[in-house]
Amino acid sequence: MRIAIGADHGGFELKNKIFDYLSKLEDIEVSDFGTYSTDAVDYPDIAFMVSIEVAKGNYDYGILIDGIGIGSAMAAGKVKGILPATCNNVTTSKAAREHDNANVLVMGSGIVGLLLAKEIVNNFIRTPFGGGRHERRINKILKFEDANNKVEIEKFSEKPKKILTKDDVLYAIRNGGGVVYIDKNAIITPLAKEFADEKKVRIIKR
């Protein structure tokens, strides 16, 4: 099972702990889409990155964490094919999968603690879709989505911002480069900036 996880600055710490938890499960492959510090970022950028990867079929599920769990769900729901669910208890996490076939779980770090978050995540990813009458209802949602021209992946006009991390700088050094080229709208984490300055690596936006 492949899972994409991401958070804004409000969900950064809980996201890291959930990432570590999932990384230790043998049947799970998890990828971290940022953010990588507590510096303020815009939750739609992270939500779009994770949701697009899930919609493309590159990941089975997405997990998004912000302060309350509402904004990221709103953003994720704008990506065609994404059925996000804000779940701040175990009951809703089970129902989101069994009844609604949700493929992106959203949580609020200001609402749930680590132990509850682990339970929510585990129930979400382990609960199969019930199908039957539930499938009929979900199909109505998807049909309405198609008819009303929601944002499609291939037509996504604003590319999500790249987040430059220390690992990106290290990769450049290992490949003999003293320069890292990034998009003009990219986010540079403080650790990446400090590391680049220390190693005399230039970061050029273009």
Ranges and model annotations:
Residues 13-24:
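Short, solvent-exposed amphipathic alpha-helices that sit
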Residues 50-86:
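Helix-adjacent hinge/juxtasegments
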Residues 118-119, 143-206:
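Intrinsic disorder
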